[in-house]
């Protein structure tokens, strides 16, 4: 048993602040929180926290780790006047240039930086059309190396190679889900990685692909992870070719349920939002990505039952993401305040609970010991009623001191327990090679 002694225990939702308490952890689970636990458990080891903030682990609920080597990209990118041209000229060339090495180092770098930013878990959405089979296992290797809890999937699409590409994407999703099932039975590795069934977006998945995805969801017991209504084009395409709203079309194939994760959703219809809520599915808002891609703003956030936050590939700094989500909402005239976005941030843990079959997101006995530990010397009182305001206007990822995942300190006193410099050096080489491959693509 390990006791984190003298902590400031903070929950964002339901909001709660307890100063000077201890947290007792047995294996990967919290067993007690309260005063003087070292007296109750005299044989336990302990770490003195000196009043540091300890909160339930932070989750990035939608990310693209395959884009980790795109920072400062020097490949020749044609002008991108709109969202679709941005996809075609940048992202759909980058993902075609990925190979096993570049994907592995992209996964490593993104995992390292997620943890340094305070994330204990990331929900990833992957694409590498030239390297489909085995790609999700490569990402899993990166997650396990660093100690990050994660979910991933392959974004099924027909955009490069038609029905063959659809089949290969679905097969990789199924293969990976079954690999996870076998790994859980073997218990030789920590259960840190789970699977979704992935799809790119409705406008690149025909009905034949949705039927394949329905069968994959049914066969594996996993939920769908898909972009939808990120841009008006997706909605117009669905109306023109299928005569249906986006989520209504997905629901026709039994793809909207309590494990479904829909990213973006800026232009979902009122009926689609009702459907999403009735099926208890999740919408993940990616404020900075929407701003960067100039796709518009989601004016319906207050109507969403299960709202979570993600980055869509712009790092994994969820402190920053929550700030932008709130500020952009205010700029757009929205009605929500910081506490609503703090709740959305914590909702990522509900996604973990639904998919890992365990309890995440509270500092209570029986919950997973996934914890974010911060140095934050507040200049004003830190209270349950104002903790969301402290994050919106002050506390950031620079305060992250340590991160615990599954009861293990994977990042302690701002250090990993392995050499990171060599990983970054190799990542730079892999990035340069990938950029050259991008330039060689038509």
Curated annotation (Swiss-Prot):
Q: Where are the transmembrane segments?
A: none
Q: What is its EC number?
A: 3.-.-.-
MF annotations from Gene Ontology: hydrolase activity, acting on carbon-nitrogen (but not peptide) bonds; metal ion binding
At which positions is Zn(2+) bound? 62, 64, 227, 312
InterPro entries in the cross-refs: Amidohydro-rel, Aminohydrolase_SsnA, Metal-dep_hydrolase_composite, Metal_Hydrolase, MTA/SAH_deaminase
Tell me which Gene Ontology terms the entry assigns under biological process: negative regulation of cell growth
> What domain of life is recorded for the organism?
Bacteria
Q: What induces it?
A: In stationary phase.
Alphabetical UniProt keywords: Hydrolase, Metal-binding, Zinc
Gene3D superfamilies in UniProt: Metal-dependent hydrolases, Urease, subunit C, domain 1
State the similarity comment: Belongs to the metallo-dependent hydrolases superfamily. ATZ/TRZ family.
Report the NCBIfam families cross-referenced here: PRK07203.1 (NF005540), Se_ssnA (TIGR03314)
Q: What is this protein called?
A: Putative aminohydrolase SsnA
Gene assigned in the entry: ssnA
């Amino acid at each position: 048993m390990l006791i984190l002694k003298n902590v400031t225990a903070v929950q964002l939702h339901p909001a709660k602040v307890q100063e000077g308490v201890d947290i007792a952890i047995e294996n990967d689970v919290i067993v007690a929180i309260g005063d003087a636990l070292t007296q109750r458990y005299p044989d336990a080891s302990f770490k003195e926290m000196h009043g540091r903030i300890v909160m339930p682990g932070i989750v990035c609920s939608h990310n693209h780790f395959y884009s980790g080597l795109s920072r400062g990209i020097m490949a020749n990118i044609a002008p991108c006047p709109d969202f679709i041209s941005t996809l075609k000229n940048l992202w759909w060339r980058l993902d075609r240039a990925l190979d096993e090495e570049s994907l592995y180092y992209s996964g490593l770098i993104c995992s390292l930086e997620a943890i340094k930013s305070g994330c204990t878990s990331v929900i990833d959405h992957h694409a590498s059309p030239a390297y489909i089979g085995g790609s999700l296992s490569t990402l899993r290797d990166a997650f396990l190396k660093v100690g990050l809890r994660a979910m991933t999937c392959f974004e099924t699409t027909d955009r490069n190679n038609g029905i063959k590409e659809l089949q290969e994407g679905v097969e990789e999703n199924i293969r990976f889900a079954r690999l996870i099932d076998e790994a859980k039975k073997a218990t030789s590795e920590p259960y840190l990685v789970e699977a979704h069934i992935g799809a790119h977006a409705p406008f690149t998945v025909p009905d034949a692909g949705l039927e394949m995805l329905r069968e994959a969801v049914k066969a594996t017991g996993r939920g769908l992870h898909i972009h939808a209504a990120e841009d008006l084009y997706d909605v117009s395409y669905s109306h023109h070719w299928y005569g249906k709203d986006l989520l209504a079309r997905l629901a026709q194939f039994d793809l909207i349920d309590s494990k479904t994760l829909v990213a973006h959703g800026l232009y979902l219809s009122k009926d689609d939002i009702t459907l999403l809520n009735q099926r208890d599915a999740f919408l993940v808002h990616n404020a900075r990505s929407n701003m960067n891609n100039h796709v518009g703003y989601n004016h319906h956030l207050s109507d969403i039952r299960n709202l979570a936050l993600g980055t869509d590939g712009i790092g994994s700094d969820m402190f920053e993401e929550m700030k932008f989500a709130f500020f952009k909402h205010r700029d757009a005239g929205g009605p929500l305040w910081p506490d609503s976005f703090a709740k959305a941030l914590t909702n990522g843990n509900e996604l973990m609970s639904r998919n890992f079959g365990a309890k995440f997101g509270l500092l209570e006995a029986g919950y997973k010991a996934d914890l974010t530990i911060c140095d934050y010397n507040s200049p004003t009182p830190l209270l349950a009623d104002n903790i969301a305001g402290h994050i919106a206007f002050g506390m950031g990822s620079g305060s992250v001191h340590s991160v615990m995942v599954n009861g293990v300190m994977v990042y302690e006193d701002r250090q990993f327990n392995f050499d990171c410099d060599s990983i970054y050096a190799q990542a730079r080489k892999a990035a340069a090679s990938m950029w050259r491959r991008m330039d060689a693509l038509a």
